[in-house]
Curated annotation (Swiss-Prot):
One of its GO terms (molecular function) is metal ion binding. Pfam families: Metallothio_2 (PF01439). Keywords: Metal-binding, Metal-thiolate cluster. The keyword Metal-binding applies. The keyword Metal-binding applies. Belongs to the metallothionein superfamily. Type 15 family. Metallothioneins have a high content of cysteine residues that bind various heavy metals. This is Metallothionein-like protein 1B. It comes from the Eukaryota.
Length: 75
């Protein structure tokens, strides 16, 4: 069971922990490249691919405002 109720009353189930860390959440981070160009002028630093995401065990049910699913796409 996904813990998410889809339909007209789309909301997350009991396992929803909006804005809180819980054991039901996993953290993933994408590798980041940093390019530093040095020379006569000031240093320029550029970051590429600085992305972070949180994934839950609720089968695609992401918590939005007021602990509702955003978007409601439960599997």
């Amino acid at each position: 069971m996904s813990g998410c109720n889809c339909g007209s009353s789309c909301n997350c189930g009991d396992s929803c922990k909006c804005n809180k860390r819980s054991s039901g959440l996993s953290y993933s981070e994408v590798e980041t490249k940093e390019t530093v160009i040095l020379g006569v002028g000031p240093a320029k630093i550029q970051f590429e691919g600085a992305e972070m995401s949180f994934a839950s065990k609720e089968g695609g049910c992401k918590c939005g405002d007021n602990c509702t699913c955003d978007p409601c796409n439960c599997k």
